[in-house]
Amino acid sequence: MAVIRLEVEPLIPTLKNDSICRQAQQFLNIKLERMSEIQFYLISGAEHKKPELQELIGKTGHEVFCDPITSRYQLRSYDLGQHQDPQFVVEVSYKPGVTDNTGHSASEGLKLLEISAEVASGKLYFLHGNLNLGEAQTVAFELLGNELIENVFVYSYKEFFHVDRFSECIFPKVVLKAKLEPETITLNVTNAELEQISLDRCLALTLDEMNVIKNYFENEEVIKKRTTQNLPIWPTDVELEVLAQTWSEHCKHKIFAAKINYSEENIKGYKRLGQQNIGGLYKDLIKNSTKRIEKEQGKDWLISVFSDNAGIVRFDNSIDLCIKVETHNSPSALDPYGGALTGILGVNRDILGCGLGARPIANMDVFCFAPPALAEQIGRDNLPVGPKEPRRILEGVHLGVEDGGNKSGIPTVNGAFFFEENFAGKPLVFVGTVGALPQKLPDGRNTSSKNANSKDRIFMIGGAIGADGIHGATFSSLELNENSPATAVQIGDPLTQKRTSDFLLEARDLGLYSSVTDNGAGGLSSSVGEMATMTGGAEIDLSLCPMKYPGLTPYELMISESQERMTVAVPPLKGEEFLALAKARGVSASDIGEFNQGGYLSIYYGKNLVADLELDFLHDGLPSMNLCAKWDGPRIKESWLKDGLIENKGGKTTIKEGLNSLLSRPNIVSKESWVRRYDHEVQAATHIKFFGI
């Protein structure tokens, strides 16, 4: 397989490099005098020998890889000019298996020129200044790359130029040894061992929940049925992972649904509410209250609440609005850019999967972070272990939401920033999308209703499945620490999502499917598992699912939240037309199974049954969480920060100094420079502009 390297040298300096130099000097106290960068691509062509591939790319490089006015490309060693004589060189590229949008776009561009090749991208950063190795490594890992998802290498000048990087090209490949036989998880163990199983597998299940699962598989009727199916008595890893995903805090909102025994002390000066049992914050105080208000006040504009991927409200006589907001905190703490990008694209997908598919028309966000300068104020060693430092979270999260909206053609129309020290442990990344939904389709169906039918084919459309996104649902229920799983972090692909979105809305108007939902935090487990409740059962074959690379196990295929994926119920007679439209629009579509009325979620890998879960147990078997709440009066807020870590800036000698200090606080200072990076004009429908223009 031929692999060649192409480098793109900018002819115009970028402001980003100047910004990184300022950050290194201001926040890291490192005198980085100048930095330049070069984008590089590794191009792998299975159908071509190396000289032939070099010739092809040499003729077409200006069409795909660079703008000849602002940059130039090279396929062989060349004079580095402005990049000469750096102190250190940093190479940053995505780890194998991590979504590489730049490389993917380049591969798509080559395909348009009838060149079949895989492309991986990366960057070279040339650091100039009186730096030592430790300082160069600090700049590399704090400002240029993220070890969680990227390979970051720091070379001295001599080391870098000693290697002929154009002749020794290795294309990044994921190498996994597939274990296609499911693993049996024996639950006939002690309580301590049950808790350890949950911890080791990142299931986020409590001991009570593990025992409920254990008792289910000890049931004689269950054992009898499983024996006839040639399944082990105890759950397979596929079954246990599906249960953990379905019962996760992310999907079931167990704390919101918990029964609460409330009591209080008789505190003078405060009104007593009295001891009471609350059936759950969600059920009693949110859902029931909403239903009661809807009935008592005749709120006929509430079309769908608490039952779909987003709420649906009536806008006028022909259009309904869909609204969805969601947090994406834990992934954004580990990989700020990827976590936030995944978050905003996720709520876009929720809108696409609402009813029979709505069109996203606006994004919104609220960010709560620790103050950006906290690391400099208290020292990095005093920050919580696990999350990135606050400034990197702010910059990465903002860029992720910016790219998610701008590159998908969805305007960001409102939002907020808030800063407080306690968000150093876990930021709040609150993202939302508004969608427009026609009330009727051309065939007369109500667009707000989903009606999957038995015998409908199960199609998976959009992105392929990878290891990124595994345990996204359960991971978000756990405390962040240095052992948080890297596979729970993924990077979205706005290009694939845009194509999938346009295709889906076209298929909707042609009446090609009966129901749709997104592949949320549990991938096929959540989408097929939820849609199966409409018909009473489903059967799928995981071996039919497209993969980013070979070697994924059945449970990984089932629960991975690969981005830009939807599950669609297609009537049998519409299958060929659905596939033809997908091919014409450049969208991957795979027929992986069928909905039925059997009462089970049956999962195969080829001819082997790897999981068979009763839908009633899967969706209704979760034991209710019981909590006790006691109010014993107001408490003084305590800080996790050690005394003296943050300088007291009070006692300014002049009003001017005090005012300047006040106006520079992160919650008061202008956010205009951040907000203006959002595209709020795309789709040409934003009437009230930011900052009055």
Question: Where are each of the predicted segments found?
Answer:
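Short amphipathic alpha-helix segments
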Residues: 12-29, 57-58, 98-114, 529, ...
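Short, solvent-exposed interaction modules
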Residues: 63, 67-119
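Helix N-cap motif at beta-to-alpha junctions
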Residues: 46-51, 129-136, 569-576
